[in-house]
Amino acid sequence: MASQGTKRSYEQMETGGERQNATEIRASVGRMIGGIGRFYIQMCTELKLSDYEGRLIQNSITIERMVLSAFDERRNKYLEEHPSAGKDPKKTGGPIYRKIDGKWMRELILYDKEEIRRIWRQANNGEDATAGLTHIMIWHSNLNDATYQRTRALVRTGMDPRMCSLMQGSTLPRRSGAAGAAVKGVGTMVMELIRMIKRGINDRNFWRGENGRRTRIAYERMCNILKGKFQTAAQRAMMDQVRESRNPGNAEIEDLIFLARSALILRGSVAHKSCLPTCVYGLAVASGHDFEREGYSLVGIDPFRLLQNSQIFSLIRPNENPAHKSQLVWMACHSAAFEDLRVSSFIRGKRVVPRGQLSTRGVQIASNENMETMDSSTLELRSRYWAIRTRSGGNTNQQRASAGQISVQPTFSVQRNLPFERATVMAAFIGNTEGRTSDMRTEIIRMMESAKPEDVSFQGRGVFELSDEKATSPIVPSFDMSNEGSYFFGDNAEEYDN
């Protein structure tokens, strides 16, 4: 990206910081992570969780959801103005699991939001530490990306379910700021824009008046975020058209769907960060690790290191496979839901299988599930190598991909060919070049057709031994590209339901 000089790194977005040098960034990200860890330790004390219970990922998720809810100002305001039966707008809670006489029991807890906010601020030197909250949101988003398909949501907005590799971050709340915007896939942005345009079509006051002016500003901002993800001039020019439209309607929806499809080959830049469950940070802080002093990066070796030395657990349903549960969480931790499985397998040092072959449901346990039969097992989150997370889609080229997911969105900066099913992608573009964006469409289609299989993405980038923390000796793996590389291939993952 030519504009690299003017861009803030994700760590800077993550910590809300202005431009800083590498050491300052590592320190401010470390400060954020340390604050999250201190908060977790304090919550475990408040809830009287044993060491083992504090390492249970389900307890971690409940605590995370409580703090996100405590700071969700818009929802809190809404709840106070629209009191609903049996919901106290000032309280938040969830299931906490405890081991009693060798059995896991569920206990529903309720806390004052004010109290949670106090504990959070206290752990973060008295500040609101919004960056830490966003970090937790991204971890939840990465977990959703690895767990669920978005077929229904894609179909509802007129997109193709096979475009699932573009849907990173589709469950992130709008309030997730610049760091959240950086990790959203092209499909996610397109879907948000289409929903907005559809509301405008159905409600003639949507773009009018003082509210409409704010809506318009939000629309243009989202268009600019999406434009910034595209790497070719023609795609960006098309986004300018969509943004400048006086009265966005079906023509804009068409253009956006066209752009989303084009991103299967002309990939957008989507950031990837390893965001870990809060209990992992808590364990590290409790064992005396000083994140701010040591510094931390979300895109380097640090998260791999942390996972090498933390033992955390998960509840397991009777017919689930603990190894599969571990894979799900490993993928979520490294934001690798849409990465090529061959790359993930190499880095993890264990075969990573497609979603459809996993004998596991999501990590969270529904309130009506029977606890009698629940067991717990250790999550195996270690890796054989580490690799730098990427913020670009890599160069583009042709390769066979699959019936389910027809492209990948790389997570790790590792040299390889990027697979996608050229025939399938191109079939979507037949004869669709009329209208005011026709020259751009023609140009985009031409670029897609000329993308070559032998072009290697991330030239010379490789994986590193875990002892090579300065990334000095890259190992460039060779992949057997004849195999299937998509995670959501021919898939039966559950749908994501709010």
From Swiss-Prot:
Localization annotation: Virion; Host nucleus
Signal peptide positions (record): none
SUPFAM superfamilies given in the database record: flu NP-like
Keyword terms, alphabetized: Capsid protein, Helical capsid protein, Host nucleus, Host-virus interaction, Ribonucleoprotein, RNA-binding, Viral nucleoprotein, Viral penetration into host nucleus, Virion, Virus entry into host cell
Classification via InterPro entries: Flu_NP (IPR002141)
Motif position, Unconventional nuclear localization signal: 1-18
Assigned GO CC terms: helical viral capsid; host cell; host cell nucleus; ribonucleoprotein complex; viral nucleocapsid
A single BP term in Gene Ontology: viral penetration into host nucleus
Record's subunit section: Homomultimerizes to form the nucleocapsid. May bind host exportin-1/XPO1. Binds to viral genomic RNA. Protein-RNA contacts are mediated by a combination of electrostatic interactions between positively charged residues and the phosphate backbone and planar interactions between aromatic side chains and bases.
Record-given protein name: Nucleoprotein
Organism of derivation: Influenza A virus (strain A/Swine/Ohio/23/1935 H1N1)
